[in-house]
Amino acid sequence: EPLYLRVKPGMEMAAAFLDSRKYGAIRGATSEFTKMEGVTHNPQDKQLFVAMSMIEGGMVADKNGRRPQDHIRLEGDAADLNCGGIYRAPMQGGQMDSDGSLIASEWVAASMSGYLMGRRKPAGQTVGPYDRCDTDRIANPDNIKYSSAMRTLFIGEDSSNHLNNFLWAHNVADGETVRVLSAPIGGELTGLQVVPDI
């Protein structure tokens, strides 16, 4: 491992708090994520959703640099990856930590994969003439919130790839995704909450 990633004996606790990302990587954690933003969960199906505003840098194959772990090696068009996406992680029990000890929880993310992905604007799309990502798909998701009652994942954008940031509603039961709100130019959709029965 590179010299700058060594931890002096007895300083593990300090390292864990002073530079959690690097120390986690030394311990085997995946550290290549770029622009990881909102997190929410679906308790009925035991799924965790994570907004990845941009997919670049260490997440892309052969772009990891000197990081001690290289768990993520995505391939694909950089213009598509630049539009970000929502990742989904099933949660389950029976998982071990990096020391081989059983984690005493049934809510451990065991794997993660792309779920709802943005993509570059297709040639000939006339809607959203200033958008660089497909106007009919999410772009650079930032804030997310899951509603158990509605079985719906709400996704707020913070994107320079859509002129207007959108709020999307994705039904996890039927897979339908609809745009429900367009913010004014430069307006970020943040602080998402679901308040049933108003």
Predicted region positions:
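Conserved small-residue
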Residues: 1-198
